[in-house]
Design a protein with these regions (language model features):
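N-terminal pre-domain/capping segments
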Residues: 1-104, 135, 173, 177, ...
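Histidine-acidic metal/acid-base catalytic patches
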Residues: 1-7, 14-31, 63, 103, ...
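A generic structural signal for short
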Residues: 9-10, 46-47, 83-84, 125-126, ...
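Active-site-proximal loop/turn and secondary-structure-junction residues that shape catalytic pockets
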Residues: 12-14, 37-39, 75-78, 111-115, ...
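Active-site acidic/histidine proton-transfer and metal-coordination neighborhood
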Residues: 19-20, 63-65, 80-180
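Short beta-strand segments at enzyme active-site cores
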Residues: 34-35, 69-74, 105-112, 148-151, ...
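A short acidic, helix-capping loop that chelates divalent metal ions and anchors anionic groups
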Residues: 41-45, 78-82, 115-121, 186-189, ...
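Charged helix-capping and loop-helix junction motifs
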Residues: 48-55, 85-93, 123-134, 161-165, ...
Length: 275
């Protein structure tokens, strides 16, 4: 069974310096973070603003506050069917060396919502574009020894365990792994079939998971998504962790997304109840 390390998404704590933000999450009892510089450091407007000095400051904050950067969040549209895709690939590649310098567990991204695609774009086309992007990224990641984590989401180009397995099999890179956001694989259509979701994740991708996201969600009568507390969520955490506890990884970060700092203690207790 993995050692589960409880963490938080850093930009849920607002904006500040790495030292300020890492100090806050550490004081609240978290031991790891997902760090997205553009979302939490005011001086970072573009990836070019992630300077060597900022990275060194972040490394110092990691050590001072005993915080692990589990995921370097570099959420760009790698499967978008327009001319911006190549710029997004360049942005992502520029952060690979940052990931290595931070000692981050992985550099992570989702795979583009289908609603953002030009009209007529099929999911198969979007997945092909994702593979083209990864084909440019992964050789550089392998050369640096950096892990790339891709995150399936029900309404994105890579929308299931099977779709994710297809991408991994296509790319055949030891440096391509999976971020498992439990709630992102649950929709109004499959909320009553979560046992199957967790089975598929474990069977197809279990040993490829490098981080877990933990958040609350439910669904309105029309099927639209509602953000909730963890206690009110429709996500079957117990079922998901029954699978996760069987995995061979020595450790897995479990990151609270949509964290509410005032609820940190109760959220951590709730999360650890499934470990």
């Amino acid at each position: 069974m993995p050692n589960f390390i409880v963490g938080a998404r850093l930009h849920d704590y607002g904006k500040g310096t790495p030292d300020e933000l890492f100090g806050q999450v550490s004081a609240d009892g978290f031991a790891a973070v997902q760090l997205a510089y553009k979302k939490c450091v005011p001086t970072v407007k573009s990836y070019a603003d992630v300077t060597d000095a900022l990275v060194a400051e972040t490394v110092a904050a990691e050590k001072a506050h005993h915080i692990q950067v589990a995921v370097l969040g570099t959420y760009v549209e790698l499967a978008i069917n327009d001319e911006s895709r190549l710029c997004n690939v360049a942005d992502f590649k520029s952060q690979l060396s940052v990931c290595k310098a931070l000692g981050a567990g992985c550099i992570g991204t989702e795979t583009t919502a289908m609603s953002k695609q030009p009209a007529g774009t099929t999911r198969a086309q979007a997945q092909e574009l994702l593979c083209r992007s990864l084909a440019e990224i992964l050789p550089a990641a392998e050369a640096l020894g950096v892990t790339v984590g891709i995150e399936p989401v029900t309404y994105h180009s890579m929308n299931s365990a099977a779709a994710t397995r297809h991408i991994l099999d296509t790319m055949r890179s030891p440096n391509l792994k999976v971020i498992f956001d439990m709630s992102n694989l649950v929709s109004a259509e499959n909320v009553d079939a979560q046992d199957r979701i967790w089975y598929d994740m474990g069977a197809l991708l279990g040993d490829q998971i490098v981080a877990v996201h933990f958040k609350g969600q439910a669904f309105a009568p029309d099927g639209s998504l509602l953000h909730t507390s963890l206690e009110e969520s429709r996500t079957d955490y117990a079922g998901a962790f029954a699978m996760l506890r069987q995995l061979p990884q020595p450790a897995l970060p479990v990151l609270r997304e949509e964290a509410v700092p005032a609820r940190a203690a109760s959220d951590i207790a709730f999360m650890k109840g499934f470990f």
